[in-house]
Amino acid sequence: MVEASEGTLEPIGAVQRTLVGREATEPMRADIGLLGAILGDTVREQNGQQVFELVERARVESFRVRRSEIDRAELARMFAGIDIHQAIPVIRAFSHFALLANVAEDIHRERRRAIHVAAGEPPQDSSLAATYAKLDRAQLDSATVAEALRGAVVSPVITAHPTETRRRTVFVTQHRITELMRLHAEGHIETDDGRNIELELRRQVLTLWQTALIRLSRLQITDEIEVGLRYYAAAFFKVIPRVNAEVRNALRARWPGADLLDEPIVAPGSWIGGDRDGNPNVTADVVRRATGDAAYTALAHYLAELTACEQELSMSARLVAVTPELAALAEDCAEKARADEPYRRALRVIRGRLTATAAEILDRRPQHELDLGLPPYATPAELRGDLDTVDASLRAHGSALLADDRLALLREGVRVFGFHLCGLDMRQNSDVHEEVVAELLAWAGVHPDYRSLPEDERVELLAAELGTRRPLVGDRAELSELADKELGVVRAAAHAIRRYGPAAVPNYVISMCRSVSDVLEAAILLKEAGLIDASGPEPYCPVGISPLFETIEDLHNGAAILHAMLELPLYRALVAARGQSQEVMLGYSDSNKDGGYLASSWAVYRAELALVEVARKTGIRLRLFHGRGGTVGRGGGPSYEAILAQPPGAVNGSLRLTEQGEVIAAKYAEPQVAQRNLESLVAATLESTLLDVEGLGDTAEPAYAVLDEVAVLAQRAYAELVHETPGFVDYFMASTPVSEIGSLNIGSRPTSRKPTESIADLRAIPWVLAWSQSRVMLPGWYGTGSAFEQWIAAGPQSRAERVDILHDLYRRWPFFRSVLSNLAQVLAKSDLGLAAQYAELVDDAALRRRVFGKIADEHRRTIAMHKLITGQDNLLADNPALARSVFNRFPYLEPLNHLQVELLRRYRSGDDDELVQRGILLTMNGLTSALRNSG
């Protein structure tokens, strides 16, 4: 057993008895020790002493590598030739430990926040309490706040992800372990039903060990839909209504004259089942399944909660009075039972009408139905009205305490989830729209060769078509398979809107949008499904069209495209029909793959500035949708800091952002963690909207000029490696598991948009995931070191003066500070020693030396530049929590990386044993869980 210290971690299989190191981390280390001990015991009992000793030996040797006591090659030799039947349990052991360590870290964060609050210390940044204090100090007037927060919305949009393949069984078991560890952290020995907590933990870990972590078959879209919906029962149904009510009440208390937030501020969305960009598996049936399952989830939840409310609100008319409205509602219950229990009778009426609603709009029947022969609710507002009647009666007769419990959450839930649960966005590539619209125009005899037209003639033709009511084709038109499929999808969306309301499919996103005609082509498809009618004086447009600007060039051109869109009278009328609101989506992933981290980050910032200016000049309300991935290489990083780093006017009360894969699980799988993360999003949105957070003042333009220059240098350095180095694609394909990401059973979507090995056609997720698995993390930092080094050396000022300029920007500018903070996180998680092991998978020695040499040189250069600009010797000096997490868990990743390299070598040498393939997939999932934002 290795003695625990700040430099080591508890061994799997041995409880840490003596806690040392910083006092604040001792409880977390004890939790990790307990879970590690239970896991170790389970491995020994289930797989034998030999496997346990192999796991322990791997752990010990990994620590020796980290302390530079042995060369990494020794650990690699330990796994060379390992029997696959021994390799699998070793991989599973370290993967499970990563999962359990995540639980311990999450519990510890909750514990530290509770201690912080109990000690009466000032609220922490990113909390709503801290934000309210800042708003109080700003002394804002009601009119300013009312205008700024008009139509405010914070929308995390759940998307599918190829590495989030955990089965529901694993998800539920992990949740149970978290609940048990929370009780343990509170000092309990037994659960509420008298079970010994440690014994129950052992049961759950045993269940986890005996449950397959991953599916044997490729993940289907229906699986991904189920994965996305599980977060509602796990957290969203409780947390989102609570956050919405708390924020509305807090803001109205401060500005009672502003009449704030009539609509919920937090409103979730989804792409799962609607995003068909490069995914041929998304069809009309899938759209119907996604929207139908979402509606089922919402109504099933309401029926269950109404049943629980019935049981709880048992008040007798002999003891309490009720309002006339409540009495009238209860009278609609024809049942003779419960004659003196008006609240129960009223709630049964509501449940009966909701049962009728479910029968009318759902394709399957939920539990807790009650058929009373009553009419269905026409809208969620009608349901909410009846719930408000119950609430008002309770409050009017001394029962506010009861009204503020389950009923309050249900009322808020109906406000935000409606009958649709969450808005499903549609997304498709502009090239597909162009091909389909050209076919429709030719079929209708409008133009035989639309694709040959120049842009101005395209716009003129499309605008004319949108101004007519007639469709281009009928249901019986003989079209290509692609056109039939695309029309089927938008018609399925129209069906969902008719069934579940306009919020069911609120947006249509156009990938790779490069022109006004790209926007109008999408509008034509929506018109064919009856979702746009611009022929009359009051246009109908329930679905907003969101251009997505993804590449560096498209981000540069985005504002001009938006301005041209708004110059078209017909399109401007559609925007007016949607309350003068226009959404624009910004792509972090493809712009990063296109130009590198720094160039991409700055291109997005510049695009936002320009888009905000267009919105100001044209009088529209702009909402930006951030296509952020989990990793820094795909726009990820701490959301609070990222939102505060937005330019002035970019947030404007509203924000949408994608949440993906293992990041969803890390943020939203547990109610306490979910509440903290949602509050953080709202807090940052309020601050960015109502306060001056940029902090540059009159020095903004000189600061922008500096980043203009640095971004050009960064993009040049990145392009020199990724786009111009001969053999780079071959190196990438060989030195990372990118090929296996596509060939193994990961995700429903192909890894490339087209069947090529081009970096341009490769999707951003496998691009980033592959570099993360190999521990290079290249998309999150490459080119940045060279750019800063060259900029410092190139100017008219002295080197010291140039460094001072950058340091001053780091100190004063949230955007620049966020860029360098995210950069540091990626560098801290990278490991060029392990990356060298992956480089050995490249057969061409000269290519290996050339490319890896450039990567290693730039890595050293980037770390040096970060230190120079920030003045921090430690990459994570400003993030001690992450520093401890990285330090504690990384020795446990070492075996996973070495085993992945070993199994990749075997697989590529022709060993197609199913266990070898499964082992590779297990290492991917283990590393993903441990890194928590790897793809």
From Swiss-Prot:
GO terms for molecular function: magnesium ion binding; phosphoenolpyruvate carboxylase activity. GO terms for biological process: carbon fixation; oxaloacetate metabolic process; tricarboxylic acid cycle. InterPro entries: PEP_COase, PEP_COase_bac/pln-type, PEP_COase_Lys_AS, PEPCASE_His_AS, Pyrv/PenolPyrv_kinase-like_dom. Its cofactor is Mg(2+). Keywords: Carbon dioxide fixation, Lyase, Magnesium. PROSITE patterns: PEPCASE_1 (PS00781), PEPCASE_2 (PS00393). It catalyses: oxaloacetate + phosphate = phosphoenolpyruvate + hydrogencarbonate. It comes from the Bacteria. Signal peptide: none annotated. The active site is at residues 161, 593. GO terms for cellular component: cytosol. Its EC number is 4.1.1.31. Pfam families: PEPcase (PF00311). NCBIfam families: PRK00009.1 (NF000584). Forms oxaloacetate, a four-carbon dicarboxylic acid source for the tricarboxylic acid cycle. Belongs to the PEPCase type 1 family. This is Phosphoenolpyruvate carboxylase. It comes from Mycobacterium avium (strain 104).
